[in-house]
A protein has these predicted regions:
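Catalytic domains of riboflavin
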Residues: 1
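Short beta-strand-centered segments at strand-helix junctions
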Residues: 5-118, 128-159
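Short, charged beta-turn/beta-strand-edge "cap" motif at the junction between a beta-strand
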Residues: 120-124, 165
């Protein structure tokens, strides 16, 4: 089974309050694959870095970093806060599969399960421990950060093999 990969750089999800306090008038740059979500033209600054904003607003402010970005910001000796759901603060997102409940049932998957993806080619390899996230409206996509995508030379929108065991 093939699945499309989407590669994300550092970005943030803001609360309504933070969005208003920032003084930014967030305008849509483009829709993204998950229904109802979009990327803003504007960037939010935390005083150190600028983050692309993903909307709509959430209940907690969240700043998603690659492992490389985490190490640059906090150092190698600071254990990353691994994101599984919608934890607040600075997090390193776990690679994950978005899948609808109907598709998940067809594959025998439950929310929180893990699958793998495989990429062929000059940088062939496999990424295990891809967290399964299920919601009725999810589009079937794997989300990777730039570190993971670069390791296997996966381009945004490229298809890879999904391995369900």
């Amino acid at each position: 089974m093939k699945v499309i990969c989407e590669v994300s750089n550092k970005h943030c999800h803001l609360t309504e309050e933070t969005s208003k306090k920032s003084g930014l008038n967030l305008t849509k740059l483009k829709d993204i694959s998950q229904p109802g979500q979009w990327v803003s033209k504007e960037y939010y600054s935390d005083g150190t870095e600028d983050f692309r904003v993903i909307m709509p607003c959430r209940s907690e402010d969240q700043f998603e970093l690659s492992l490389t970005d985490w190490i640059k910001r906090f150092g190698r000796d600071t254990e990353p806060k691994w994101k599984r759901n919608k934890e607040a603060g600075y997090v390193v997102t776990l690679r994950h599969l978005h899948i609808s409940d109907k598709q998940a049932k067809e594959f025998g998957l439950k929310d929180g399960d893990f699958v793998s993806i495989r990429k062929e080619g000059i940088r062939a390899g496999q990424l295990d421990k891809v967290l399964v996230r299920i919601s009725p409206n999810f589009d079937f996509r794997v989300h990777l950060d730039t570190d993971e995508a670069n390791a296997l030379y996966i381009k945004n929108g490229e298809e890879v093999d999904l391995i369900v065991t």
